[in-house]
Amino acid sequence: MANRVATPDPDIPLTQRETQVLRHMALGLSNKEIAQSLTISVETVKEHVQNILRKIAVTDRTQAAVWAVRRGLV
């Protein structure tokens, strides 16, 4: 995955780290794989995932991935 720097976008209500996690989710990575890639704990990834789902008002990872693709994050 290319290392993209998330730029603040008022239409995307996520932190830079949440955006990174969402990109990884959209590529189909597991929580463990995301944690290893971003050098954070699996528990931190889980927290970010829950925050992402809440902030973008979706109920699962698949819907979050679709949301990310539609906004050009992936």
Please describe what each predicted stretch is.
Residues 1-24:
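Regulatory hinge/linker segments at domain boundaries
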